[in-house]
């Protein structure tokens, strides 16, 4: 076994042990399948059991997101930190592109909002959006009418994050969010990875736990 394979095996063992500890401390068996997978993944990534009651999951919408991913829906993220946390799937992230900076200046909008406009222009309707950092990205998704296939809306912060997530839930768009100011790149990526594992398992390309 190569050193790379050793490291991968060690990472798998650590993750399995992490989930074992998690399940010994909280019972989420009351939740439906995809809601449970997402909630466990977020708690495992954050070591924060409050997410068991903070996340707002819609099982039917989560199932549709899994189906969309299995069908090859494009994935757009709001920040490089979110992209870095996603494994096994190509993602579109426009935040650091020069065109994003120019659009931000000329339109007088945040870079996150400009990145949403450019991402939508490239991917079109039906994409899976993953927002873990910028409330303004979530606000732009709602105001631009991007017709998402699904939105993971978990931006973090005391300024505008909870309000943006409230607006996402009020919009009726298929989504996953949380009630509090908590969130962030790691938990948004963890939620997405849980859905991706299910999609890969459904497509017969791996995944599952």
Where are these regions (language model features)?
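C-terminal functional extensions of proteins
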Residues: 159-209
């Amino acid at each position: 076994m190569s050193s790379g394979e050793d490291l991968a095996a060690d990472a798998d063992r650590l993750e399995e042990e992490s989930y074992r500890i998690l399940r010994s401390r909280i019972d989420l068996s009351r939740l439906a399948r995809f809601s449970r997978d997402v909630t466990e993944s977020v708690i495992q990534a954050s070591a924060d059991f409050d997410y068991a009651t903070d996340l707002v999951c819609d099982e039917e919408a989560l199932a549709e997101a899994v189906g969309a991913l299995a069908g090859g829906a494009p994935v757009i993220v709001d920040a490089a930190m979110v992209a870095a946390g996603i494994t096994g799937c190509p993602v579109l992230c426009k935040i650091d592109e020069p065109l994003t900076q120019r659009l931000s200046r000329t339109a007088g909008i945040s870079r996150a909002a400009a990145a949403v406009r450019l991402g939508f222009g490239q991917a079109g309707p039906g994409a899976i959006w993953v927002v873990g950092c910028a409330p303004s990205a979530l606000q732009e998704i709602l105001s631009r009418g991007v017709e998402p296939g699904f939105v993971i809306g978990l931006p973090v912060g005391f300024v505008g994050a909870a309000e943006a997530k409230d607006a996402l839930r009020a919009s009726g768009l298929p989504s996953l969010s949380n009630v509090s100011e908590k969130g962030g790149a790691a938990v948004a990526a963890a939620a997405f990875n849980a859905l991706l594992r299910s999609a890969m398992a459904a497509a017969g390309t791996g995944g599952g736990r």
